[in-house]
Design a protein with these regions (language model features):
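N-terminal subdomain of lithium-sensitive/metallo-dependent phosphomonoesterases centered on the IMPase/IPPase/PAP
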Residues: 1-86, 226, 248, 255-258
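Glycine-rich active-site/cofactor-binding loop and its immediate structural neighborhood
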Residues: 79-121
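Oxyanion/phosphate-interacting regions
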Residues: 1-13, 169-177, 190-261
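Acidic beta-strand-loop-alpha-helix segment within the catalytic core
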Residues: 104-192, 239-261
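A short, compositionally biased
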Residues: 26, 99, 127-131, 221
Length: 261
């Protein structure tokens, strides 16, 4: 584990321990609504504080971009951390274990390091550009399925932007008719990690934020998968529209989506 990932892991583990304690008394967790179907809790904020403080201490010249607290550090910094302190807030608030801490490091705008930590399972996914992806220190690879009708596809509902719902449901209906099934777990970082480890053969979702997908996407890529936008191009980090899959089914997924564009 290199120094960047070591620092990220120590901070994520500390934040994760706080989350586990908070999960034992959810009635005491304070919750605010940022927008329709978009919640933030004091656990999100506490986690972000732990992560930011650790990164500032270790790397005072790095920029840090967070879901809740915005940006810290110089806008011109060569290194930038993109952090989701609690991906899957709604799951957490309902006692579902599918939530995670997501941390990615960019150098001059290029993803270099990624860590996704799932506290309930104590699972640590990580990747370094050009060096592969790991789950709990074990190398992982995407699935090798070819036939779409044998594939399990992950997705996320556009619950915040309801204007996209009709288009999304038409795409989802097409996927469900042509695959072995669909899964909606409610934490994009973990959905992407599921693609990386082969539990899902592909994943797609619209209108995500950089902190939702940056770390998970690099983990998919380093596990042998491909990540694109809905048209098969780069730019998914900026647009938030993402498709991730093993190389053998990506084109088939993009074809289904293109039929509804």
């Amino acid at each position: 584990m290199n120094p960047f990932l070591n620092t990220a892991f120590k901070a994520a583990r500390k934040a994760g321990q706080m989350m586990i304690r908070a999960a034992g008394n959810l009635d005491a967790v304070k919750v605010d609504s940022k927008a329709f179907n978009d919640f933030v809790s004091d656990v999100d904020r506490s986690s972000e504080m732990i992560l930011v403080e650790a990164l500032k201490e270790a790397y005072p010249h790095h920029k840090i971009t967070c879901e809740e607290g915005g940006s810290h550090g110089k806008a011109t910094a060569e290194y930038e951390w993109i952090i989701d302190p609690l991906d899957g807030t709604t799951n957490f608030l309902h006692g579902h274990p599918q939530y995670a801490i997501s941390m990615a490091l960019l150098h001059k705008g290029v993803l270099q390091e990624a860590l996704v930590y799932a506290p309930e399972r104590n699972d640590v996914y990580m990747a370094s550009r050009g060096k592969g992806a790991l789950l709990n220190d074990r190398r992982i690879r995407v699935s090798n399925r070819i036939e779409l009708n044998r594939c399990l596809i992950g997705t996320g509902f556009p619950v915040v932007d309801q204007s996209m719902m009709d288009k999304y449901l038409a795409i989802l209906k097409d996927f469900l008719a042509k695959t072995a099934g669909g899964r909606r777990e409610g934490a994009a970082s973990l959905d992407l990690c599921a693609v990386a480890v082969g539990r899902l053969d592909g994943f797609f979702e619209f209108n995500l934020k950089p902190w939702d997908i940056a770390a998970g996407a690099l983990i998919v890529q380093e596990a042998g998968g491909i990540v694109t936008d809905m048209s098969g191009n780069e730019g998914w980090l900026e647009s938030g529209d993402i498709v991730a899959a093993n190389p053998k089914v990506l084109a088939q997924m993009l074809k289904i989506i293109a039929d509804h564009q």
